[in-house]
């Protein structure tokens, strides 16, 4: 039978290692975990953990391909409330900028556009994880920002 405390420690160590963004192979992760006292860890277990936690290979600051677990790369599921896909809402003098989980921006932008001018939205432009929304005539950027925050129940 598995020791839940040991499993929890393994998960914490695994996530901490990936935050360092310096491991380019599963073998390197295995060795690092073994050095931290997890003697029974192997490549297949690391592979399953990488998949389970949504790890991706990306370039770090040194332009090396490494495994990482960025929080903003949370994978949306069919049961995710839309508000969980919105990571940040900010604005300047012209537009409201909404940062979302990767792949969610067009879905959120479509929702915003469906609310229309009566709700203060002139239009939205969406990429993969960023939306630019501009207020309709008669609405300020601040009013639009507050309306979007209310819509997604974010704090000011």
Swiss-Prot record:
Keyword Iron: no
Tagged with keyword Transcription: yes
InterPro entries: Arg_repress, Arg_repress_C, Arg_repress_C_sf, Arg_repress_DNA-bd, WH-like_DNA-bd_sf, WH_DNA-bd_sf
Keywords, in A-Z order: Amino-acid biosynthesis, Arginine biosynthesis, Cytoplasm, DNA-binding, Repressor, Transcription, Transcription regulation
UniProt GO cellular component terms: cytoplasm
Region forming the signal peptide: none
Top-level taxon in the UniProt lineage: Bacteria
GO molecular function, one term: arginine binding
Biological-process GO terms, alphabetical: L-arginine biosynthetic process; protein complex oligomerization; regulation of arginine biosynthetic process
Main location: cytoplasm
Pathway: Amino-acid biosynthesis; L-arginine biosynthesis [regulation]
Cellular localisation: Cytoplasm
Gene3D superfamilies: 3.30.1360.40, Winged helix-like DNA-binding domain superfamily/Winged helix DNA-binding domain
PANTHER family: ARGININE REPRESSOR (PTHR34471:SF1)
Stated role: Regulates arginine biosynthesis genes.
Family of this protein: Belongs to the ArgR family.
Protein name: Arginine repressor
Encoding gene, per UniProt annotation: argR
């Amino acid at each position: 039978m598995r020791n839940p405390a040991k499993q929890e420690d393994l998960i914490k160590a695994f996530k901490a290692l990936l935050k360092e963004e310096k491991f380019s192979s599963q073998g390197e992760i295995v060795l690092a975990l073994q050095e931290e006292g997890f003697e029974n860890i192997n490549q297949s277990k690391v592979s399953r953990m990488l998949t389970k936690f949504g790890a991706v290979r990306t370039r770090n600051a040194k332009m090396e391909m490494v495994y990482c677990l960025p929080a903003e790369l949370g994978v949306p599921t069919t049961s995710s409330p839309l508000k969980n896909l919105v990571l940040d809402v900010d604005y300047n003098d012209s537009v409201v900028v909404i940062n979302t989980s990767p792949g969610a921006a067009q879905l959120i932008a479509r929702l915003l556009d469906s609310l229309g001018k009566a709700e203060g939205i002139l239009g939205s432009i969406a990429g993969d994880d960023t939306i630019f929304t501009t207020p309709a005539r008669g609405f300020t950027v601040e009013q639009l920002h507050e309306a979007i925050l209310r819509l997604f129940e974010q704090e000011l």
